[in-house]
Protein backbone atom coordinates (compact mmCIF):
# COMPACT_ATOMS: atom_id res chain seq x y z
CA UNK A 1 0.00 0.00 0.00
CA UNK A 2 2.11 2.87 -1.33
CA UNK A 3 -0.14 5.69 -0.13
CA UNK A 4 -0.81 4.12 3.25
CA UNK A 5 2.87 3.69 4.03
CA UNK A 6 4.30 6.84 2.47
CA UNK A 7 1.40 9.26 2.51
CA UNK A 8 0.06 11.40 -0.30
CA UNK A 9 2.51 14.15 0.57
CA UNK A 10 5.43 11.86 -0.23
CA UNK A 11 4.04 10.93 -3.63
CA UNK A 12 3.09 14.46 -4.63
CA UNK A 13 4.04 17.84 -3.19
CA UNK A 14 1.34 18.91 -0.72
CA UNK A 15 -2.25 17.72 -0.79
CA UNK A 16 -5.36 19.69 0.18
CA UNK A 17 -8.46 17.56 0.71
CA UNK A 18 -11.91 18.94 -0.13
CA UNK A 19 -14.16 17.84 2.74
CA UNK A 20 -17.93 18.07 2.24
CA UNK A 21 -19.45 17.38 5.63
CA UNK A 22 -22.32 19.79 5.08
CA UNK A 23 -24.78 17.36 3.45
CA UNK A 24 -25.44 13.78 2.38
CA UNK A 25 -26.90 12.72 -0.94
CA UNK A 26 -30.30 11.84 0.52
CA UNK A 27 -32.18 11.35 3.78
CA UNK A 28 -31.59 7.59 3.76
CA UNK A 29 -27.87 7.52 4.52
CA UNK A 30 -25.43 5.78 6.81
CA UNK A 31 -25.44 8.54 9.45
CA UNK A 32 -29.21 8.81 9.65
CA UNK A 33 -29.50 5.04 9.76
CA UNK A 34 -27.10 5.00 12.72
CA UNK A 35 -29.03 7.53 14.82
CA UNK A 36 -32.20 8.71 13.06
CA UNK A 37 -32.72 12.49 12.95
CA UNK A 38 -29.61 13.26 15.01
CA UNK A 39 -26.93 14.23 12.49
CA UNK A 40 -29.09 16.59 10.42
CA UNK A 41 -30.91 19.80 11.34
CA UNK A 42 -34.68 19.95 11.17
CA UNK A 43 -37.21 22.72 10.70
CA UNK A 44 -39.94 23.28 13.29
CA UNK A 45 -42.31 21.02 11.36
CA UNK A 46 -39.79 18.17 11.40
CA UNK A 47 -38.73 18.52 7.78
CA UNK A 48 -35.05 18.68 6.95
CA UNK A 49 -33.36 22.06 6.93
CA UNK A 50 -31.75 22.62 3.53
CA UNK A 51 -28.99 25.18 4.00
CA UNK A 52 -26.80 23.17 1.64
CA UNK A 53 -29.20 23.37 -1.28
CA UNK A 54 -28.80 19.59 -1.56
CA UNK A 55 -31.72 18.44 0.58
CA UNK A 56 -30.23 18.38 4.08
CA UNK A 57 -27.51 19.89 6.27
CA UNK A 58 -25.14 18.39 8.82
CA UNK A 59 -25.66 19.43 12.47
CA UNK A 60 -22.04 20.18 13.38
CA UNK A 61 -23.06 21.75 16.71
CA UNK A 62 -24.32 18.44 18.15
CA UNK A 63 -21.63 16.70 20.23
CA UNK A 64 -21.38 13.40 18.35
CA UNK A 65 -21.65 15.11 14.97
CA UNK A 66 -18.79 17.40 15.98
CA UNK A 67 -16.79 14.38 17.14
CA UNK A 68 -17.41 12.63 13.82
CA UNK A 69 -16.05 15.63 11.92
CA UNK A 70 -12.97 16.04 14.07
CA UNK A 71 -12.15 12.33 14.33
CA UNK A 72 -12.33 11.92 10.57
CA UNK A 73 -10.12 14.98 9.99
CA UNK A 74 -7.55 13.54 12.37
CA UNK A 75 -7.76 10.19 10.58
CA UNK A 76 -7.04 11.74 7.20
CA UNK A 77 -4.20 13.81 8.63
CA UNK A 78 -2.56 10.94 10.52
CA UNK A 79 -3.10 8.01 8.18
CA UNK A 80 -2.78 9.76 4.82
CA UNK A 81 -0.67 12.76 5.84
CA UNK A 82 -3.10 15.23 4.28
CA UNK A 83 -1.56 18.71 4.36
CA UNK A 84 -4.74 20.75 4.51
CA UNK A 85 -8.52 20.78 4.36
CA UNK A 86 -10.87 22.87 2.27
CA UNK A 87 -14.37 23.01 3.78
CA UNK A 88 -17.29 23.10 1.39
CA UNK A 89 -20.05 25.52 2.53
CA UNK A 90 -18.18 26.25 5.75
CA UNK A 91 -20.90 28.72 6.69
CA UNK A 92 -23.05 25.70 7.62
CA UNK A 93 -20.66 24.78 10.45
CA UNK A 94 -20.59 26.51 13.80
CA UNK A 95 -17.56 28.50 14.93
CA UNK A 96 -16.97 26.27 17.98
CA UNK A 97 -16.65 23.14 15.85
CA UNK A 98 -14.23 24.78 13.42
CA UNK A 99 -12.05 26.10 16.23
CA UNK A 100 -12.12 22.71 17.96
CA UNK A 101 -11.01 21.07 14.71
CA UNK A 102 -8.17 23.57 14.43
CA UNK A 103 -7.04 22.82 17.99
CA UNK A 104 -7.19 19.06 17.41
CA UNK A 105 -5.10 19.28 14.25
CA UNK A 106 -2.63 21.62 15.95
CA UNK A 107 -2.04 18.97 18.62
CA UNK A 108 -0.67 16.54 16.03
CA UNK A 109 3.09 16.46 15.29
CA UNK A 110 3.49 19.14 12.62
CA UNK A 111 -0.22 19.85 12.86
CA UNK A 112 0.16 23.62 12.91
CA UNK A 113 1.32 23.41 9.29
CA UNK A 114 -1.99 21.85 8.20
CA UNK A 115 -4.08 24.38 6.30
CA UNK A 116 -7.75 25.01 7.02
CA UNK A 117 -9.92 27.21 4.83
CA UNK A 118 -13.40 27.12 3.35
CA UNK A 119 -16.39 28.75 1.71
CA UNK A 120 -17.87 31.24 4.21
CA UNK A 121 -21.39 30.99 2.86
CA UNK A 122 -24.41 28.68 2.75
CA UNK A 123 -26.47 27.21 -0.05
CA UNK A 124 -29.81 28.30 1.39
CA UNK A 125 -31.65 29.15 4.60
CA UNK A 126 -30.30 27.20 7.58
CA UNK A 127 -31.50 26.17 11.03
CA UNK A 128 -28.04 26.77 12.47
CA UNK A 129 -28.98 29.24 15.19
CA UNK A 130 -25.56 29.91 16.65
CA UNK A 131 -22.43 31.57 15.34
CA UNK A 132 -21.83 30.38 11.78
CA UNK A 133 -18.31 30.05 10.40
CA UNK A 134 -18.85 32.86 7.90
CA UNK A 135 -17.47 36.29 7.04
CA UNK A 136 -19.57 38.07 9.65
CA UNK A 137 -17.97 35.95 12.38
CA UNK A 138 -14.45 35.97 10.99
CA UNK A 139 -13.07 37.53 14.16
CA UNK A 140 -14.36 34.54 16.15
CA UNK A 141 -12.49 32.00 14.04
CA UNK A 142 -8.94 30.92 14.78
CA UNK A 143 -6.55 33.17 12.86
CA UNK A 144 -5.36 30.13 10.90
CA UNK A 145 -8.78 29.29 9.50
CA UNK A 146 -9.15 31.06 6.16
CA UNK A 147 -12.11 32.02 4.00
CA UNK A 148 -12.55 32.36 0.25
CA UNK A 149 -12.93 36.10 -0.18
CA UNK A 150 -15.60 36.79 -2.78
CA UNK A 151 -15.07 40.52 -2.18
CA UNK A 152 -11.59 40.19 -3.67
CA UNK A 153 -12.82 37.95 -6.50
CA UNK A 154 -15.63 40.29 -7.52
CA UNK A 155 -13.52 43.43 -7.19
CA UNK A 156 -10.93 42.10 -9.62
CA UNK A 157 -12.94 40.23 -12.26
CA UNK A 158 -16.56 41.29 -11.63
CA UNK A 159 -19.60 39.63 -10.10
CA UNK A 160 -19.76 35.88 -10.58
CA UNK A 161 -23.54 35.68 -11.13
CA UNK A 162 -23.67 38.20 -13.99
CA UNK A 163 -21.53 37.16 -16.93
CA UNK A 164 -21.40 40.68 -18.36
CA UNK A 165 -20.55 42.56 -15.16
CA UNK A 166 -16.95 43.84 -15.33
CA UNK A 167 -14.45 44.18 -12.53
CA UNK A 168 -11.29 46.23 -12.17
CA UNK A 169 -9.34 44.10 -14.65
CA UNK A 170 -11.95 44.85 -17.32
CA UNK A 171 -12.01 48.57 -16.50
CA UNK A 172 -15.07 48.92 -14.24
CA UNK A 173 -15.31 52.56 -13.08
CA UNK A 174 -14.85 53.11 -9.36
CA UNK A 175 -13.63 49.60 -8.60
CA UNK A 176 -10.13 50.83 -7.71
CA UNK A 177 -11.34 51.46 -4.15
CA UNK A 178 -12.16 47.80 -3.69
CA UNK A 179 -8.86 46.74 -5.23
CA UNK A 180 -7.10 48.76 -2.55
CA UNK A 181 -9.12 46.86 0.05
CA UNK A 182 -8.17 43.56 -1.56
CA UNK A 183 -4.45 44.41 -1.54
CA UNK A 184 -4.66 44.93 2.23
CA UNK A 185 -6.67 41.69 2.64
CA UNK A 186 -9.50 43.93 3.85
CA UNK A 187 -7.65 44.53 7.13
CA UNK A 188 -7.93 48.30 6.63
CA UNK A 189 -11.59 48.23 5.69
CA UNK A 190 -14.79 47.97 7.71
CA UNK A 191 -16.10 45.52 5.10
CA UNK A 192 -15.02 42.61 7.31
CA UNK A 193 -14.57 42.18 11.09
CA UNK A 194 -11.03 42.36 12.54
CA UNK A 195 -8.95 39.47 11.25
CA UNK A 196 -5.47 38.35 10.26
CA UNK A 197 -4.51 38.88 6.59
CA UNK A 198 -3.66 35.18 6.39
CA UNK A 199 -7.38 34.41 6.88
CA UNK A 200 -8.19 35.90 3.49
CA UNK A 201 -7.96 33.51 0.53
CA UNK A 202 -7.25 35.87 -2.38
CA UNK A 203 -8.51 34.46 -5.66
CA UNK A 204 -10.42 35.21 -8.85
CA UNK A 205 -11.56 31.74 -9.96
CA UNK A 206 -12.40 28.37 -8.43
CA UNK A 207 -14.35 25.29 -9.54
CA UNK A 208 -17.72 27.06 -9.30
CA UNK A 209 -18.85 29.86 -11.63
CA UNK A 210 -17.00 31.13 -14.71
CA UNK A 211 -13.33 30.51 -15.24
CA UNK A 212 -11.30 33.71 -15.30
CA UNK A 213 -10.70 33.36 -19.05
CA UNK A 214 -14.37 32.83 -19.85
CA UNK A 215 -15.41 35.74 -17.66
CA UNK A 216 -12.97 38.10 -19.37
CA UNK A 217 -14.30 37.14 -22.81
CA UNK A 218 -17.96 37.29 -21.76
CA UNK A 219 -17.46 40.86 -20.55
CA UNK A 220 -15.81 41.90 -23.83
CA UNK A 221 -17.83 40.05 -26.44
CA UNK A 222 -21.48 39.21 -27.09
CA UNK A 223 -20.52 35.88 -28.66
CA UNK A 224 -16.98 34.99 -27.53
CA UNK A 225 -14.69 32.50 -29.24
CA UNK A 226 -13.48 30.80 -26.07
CA UNK A 227 -10.79 28.70 -27.72
CA UNK A 228 -9.29 31.56 -29.72
CA UNK A 229 -6.31 33.54 -28.48
CA UNK A 230 -7.19 37.11 -27.53
CA UNK A 231 -4.39 39.54 -26.76
CA UNK A 232 -6.52 41.88 -24.65
CA UNK A 233 -7.97 39.04 -22.58
CA UNK A 234 -4.46 37.68 -22.05
CA UNK A 235 -3.28 41.08 -20.80
CA UNK A 236 -6.30 41.35 -18.49
CA UNK A 237 -5.65 37.81 -17.25
CA UNK A 238 -2.08 38.79 -16.34
CA UNK A 239 -3.39 41.93 -14.62
CA UNK A 240 -5.89 39.93 -12.55
CA UNK A 241 -3.18 37.49 -11.49
CA UNK A 242 -0.81 40.37 -10.82
CA UNK A 243 -3.27 41.90 -8.37
CA UNK A 244 -4.12 38.93 -6.17
CA UNK A 245 -0.60 37.51 -6.27
CA UNK A 246 0.78 40.80 -4.94
CA UNK A 247 -1.90 41.17 -2.26
CA UNK A 248 -1.78 40.22 1.39
CA UNK A 249 -3.42 36.91 2.20
CA UNK A 250 -3.32 33.32 0.99
CA UNK A 251 -3.28 33.19 -2.83
CA UNK A 252 -5.39 30.54 -4.54
CA UNK A 253 -5.91 29.72 -8.20
CA UNK A 254 -8.12 27.30 -10.06
CA UNK A 255 -6.25 24.50 -11.80
CA UNK A 256 -5.68 25.64 -15.37
CA UNK A 257 -6.20 29.34 -14.74
CA UNK A 258 -2.52 29.71 -15.54
CA UNK A 259 -3.14 28.52 -19.11
CA UNK A 260 -6.42 30.33 -19.77
CA UNK A 261 -8.69 27.44 -18.85
CA UNK A 262 -12.04 27.55 -20.58
CA UNK A 263 -15.33 25.76 -19.96
CA UNK A 264 -16.78 27.30 -23.13
CA UNK A 265 -18.73 29.86 -21.10
CA UNK A 266 -20.43 27.36 -18.81
CA UNK A 267 -21.06 29.16 -15.54
CA UNK A 268 -21.51 26.11 -13.34
CA UNK A 269 -20.14 22.87 -14.71
CA UNK A 270 -20.68 20.42 -11.85
CA UNK A 271 -23.20 18.48 -13.94
CA UNK A 272 -21.32 18.87 -17.22
CA UNK A 273 -19.32 16.28 -19.09
CA UNK A 274 -15.76 15.23 -18.23
CA UNK A 275 -14.75 16.60 -21.63
CA UNK A 276 -15.77 20.10 -20.53
CA UNK A 277 -14.27 19.85 -17.05
CA UNK A 278 -10.98 18.21 -17.95
CA UNK A 279 -7.69 20.08 -18.00
CA UNK A 280 -6.68 20.73 -21.61
CA UNK A 281 -2.92 20.32 -21.46
CA UNK A 282 -2.56 21.49 -25.05
CA UNK A 283 -3.56 24.94 -23.79
CA UNK A 284 -0.67 24.78 -21.33
CA UNK A 285 1.63 24.55 -24.33
CA UNK A 286 -0.29 27.10 -26.36
CA UNK A 287 -0.26 29.61 -23.50
CA UNK A 288 3.14 28.73 -22.08
CA UNK A 289 3.98 32.44 -21.74
CA UNK A 290 1.00 32.86 -19.40
CA UNK A 291 2.11 29.81 -17.41
CA UNK A 292 5.55 31.39 -17.09
CA UNK A 293 3.94 34.63 -15.92
CA UNK A 294 2.17 32.86 -13.06
CA UNK A 295 5.30 30.91 -12.19
CA UNK A 296 7.41 34.06 -12.04
CA UNK A 297 4.90 35.95 -9.89
CA UNK A 298 4.62 33.09 -7.41
CA UNK A 299 8.40 32.93 -7.11
CA UNK A 300 8.62 36.72 -6.73
CA UNK A 301 6.02 36.65 -3.98
CA UNK A 302 7.92 33.92 -2.12
CA UNK A 303 10.91 36.26 -2.00
CA UNK A 304 8.94 38.97 -0.21
CA UNK A 305 7.55 37.17 2.88
CA UNK A 306 5.66 40.12 4.32
CA UNK A 307 2.82 39.60 1.85
CA UNK A 308 2.13 36.29 3.61
CA UNK A 309 2.24 37.75 7.12
CA UNK A 310 -0.18 36.51 9.78
CA UNK A 311 0.11 39.80 11.71
CA UNK A 312 -3.23 41.70 11.63
CA UNK A 313 -1.29 44.97 11.63
CA UNK A 314 1.08 44.12 8.76
CA UNK A 315 -1.14 45.75 6.09
CA UNK A 316 -0.95 49.02 8.04
CA UNK A 317 2.51 49.43 6.52
CA UNK A 318 1.02 49.79 3.03
CA UNK A 319 1.21 53.30 1.59
CA UNK A 320 -1.17 54.03 -1.29
CA UNK A 321 -0.27 56.76 -3.78
CA UNK A 322 -2.63 59.47 -4.97
CA UNK A 323 -2.86 58.65 -8.67
CA UNK A 324 -5.20 59.48 -11.50
CA UNK A 325 -8.17 57.13 -11.39
CA UNK A 326 -8.43 54.22 -12.05
CA UNK A 327 -4.71 53.59 -11.47
CA UNK A 328 -3.71 51.99 -8.17
CA UNK A 329 -0.22 52.18 -6.70
CA UNK A 330 1.32 51.31 -3.38
CA UNK A 331 4.58 50.65 -1.61
CA UNK A 332 5.38 48.25 1.21
CA UNK A 333 8.66 47.99 3.15
CA UNK A 334 10.03 44.56 3.93
CA UNK A 335 9.63 43.34 7.50
CA UNK A 336 12.84 43.42 9.58
CA UNK A 337 15.07 40.37 9.12
CA UNK A 338 12.50 38.37 7.12
CA UNK A 339 14.88 37.45 4.29
CA UNK A 340 13.21 39.61 1.64
CA UNK A 341 15.20 40.13 -1.54
CA UNK A 342 14.26 43.82 -1.72
CA UNK A 343 14.02 46.55 0.88
CA UNK A 344 10.55 47.44 -0.36
CA UNK A 345 8.08 46.73 -3.13
CA UNK A 346 6.41 49.38 -5.26
CA UNK A 347 3.43 48.09 -7.28
CA UNK A 348 1.13 49.70 -9.84
CA UNK A 349 -2.03 48.45 -11.55
CA UNK A 350 -3.23 49.91 -14.84
CA UNK A 351 -6.65 48.61 -16.00
CA UNK A 352 -6.87 50.92 -19.02
CA UNK A 353 -6.09 50.28 -22.69
CA UNK A 354 -3.40 52.98 -22.79
CA UNK A 355 0.09 53.32 -21.35
CA UNK A 356 0.45 55.58 -18.33
CA UNK A 357 3.40 57.39 -16.74
CA UNK A 358 3.51 57.35 -12.93
CA UNK A 359 5.87 58.95 -10.39
CA UNK A 360 8.12 56.71 -8.32
CA UNK A 361 9.12 57.22 -4.68
CA UNK A 362 12.60 58.56 -4.00
CA UNK A 363 15.44 56.15 -4.65
CA UNK A 364 16.37 53.56 -7.26
CA UNK A 365 13.84 50.91 -8.22
CA UNK A 366 14.57 47.71 -10.10
CA UNK A 367 11.88 46.53 -12.48
CA UNK A 368 10.85 43.07 -11.24
CA UNK A 369 7.73 42.41 -13.32
CA UNK A 370 5.81 44.24 -16.01
CA UNK A 371 2.73 43.54 -18.08
CA UNK A 372 4.27 40.65 -20.00
CA UNK A 373 7.18 39.22 -18.00
CA UNK A 374 7.20 38.43 -14.29
CA UNK A 375 10.77 37.12 -14.15
CA UNK A 376 12.72 40.31 -14.80
CA UNK A 377 13.87 40.15 -11.17
CA UNK A 378 15.93 37.06 -11.97
CA UNK A 379 18.43 39.04 -14.03
CA UNK A 380 20.01 42.47 -14.32
CA UNK A 381 16.86 44.32 -15.32
CA UNK A 382 16.61 48.07 -15.73
CA UNK A 383 16.43 50.38 -12.71
CA UNK A 384 14.22 53.46 -12.58
CA UNK A 385 14.19 56.77 -10.76
CA UNK A 386 11.51 59.46 -10.53
CA UNK A 387 8.99 57.93 -12.97
CA UNK A 388 8.05 54.82 -14.91
CA UNK A 389 5.83 53.76 -17.80
CA UNK A 390 2.97 51.32 -17.19
CA UNK A 391 1.81 49.13 -20.04
CA UNK A 392 -1.94 48.82 -20.79
CA UNK A 393 -3.77 46.26 -18.65
CA UNK A 394 -0.75 45.60 -16.49
CA UNK A 395 0.52 44.98 -12.99
CA UNK A 396 4.03 46.42 -12.65
CA UNK A 397 6.28 45.56 -9.72
CA UNK A 398 9.47 47.34 -8.63
CA UNK A 399 11.91 46.47 -5.87
CA UNK A 400 13.96 49.00 -3.90
CA UNK A 401 17.71 48.63 -4.48
List PLM regions with ranges.
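Alpha-helical packing segments of well-folded alpha/beta enzyme cores
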Residues: 65, 69-76, 97, 203, ...
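Carbohydrate-interacting/catalytic domains
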Residues: 230, 234, 245-253, 257-259, ...
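Short, well-ordered coil/turn segments that N-cap beta-strands
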Residues: 13, 18, 81-83, 110-114, ...
